Amino acid sequence: VFDERSIEDLILARAKSPNFTALHQFFIENPKALPFLVDLSLSQKTHPVPAYSAWLLVHIVKANPGLLAPFQEQLTAGLLQTANHSVQRSLLVVLLELPIKRKFKGELLNYCFEVFANPDTAVANRVYALYHLKRFVKSYPEIDQEVRSIIAILESQEMKPALRVGIRNYLKH
């Protein structure tokens, strides 16, 4: 029987181990524990619980996207609300592995524009937001021009290599 406390204890016990992310296999084998992991990733608990929980979600969705599909709306809502950059990064990656849903579509689109355009946001988060924008362009080709105008502004400034690579990938339609 799983509860939030037992899952939190499991994460904390394994947090410092070199193969921490191998813990994702436990959740693949015990999907009844997933709601607690999702809740912990979106919680206000102290570090490292939310960040490490969200990090495990990345490994779970890459191994078996269907396991997290039922939580997509909850994860999207959590992404839109969290200020934790580590959790944001992981949730952006998780949602890239799932199909775009109608609920929160507009909010997610606006969020990704804000994250991508904000120079104070962590570079990885900006790149993953850009990858979401690339997906949105398929449904909304008119946003491509807006994305490209942000890119033009960014290219006139000093840029981290990871952001440059993300932009190059975006432009490779």
Spans of features found by a protein language model:
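Alpha-helical scaffold domains
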Residues: 1-173
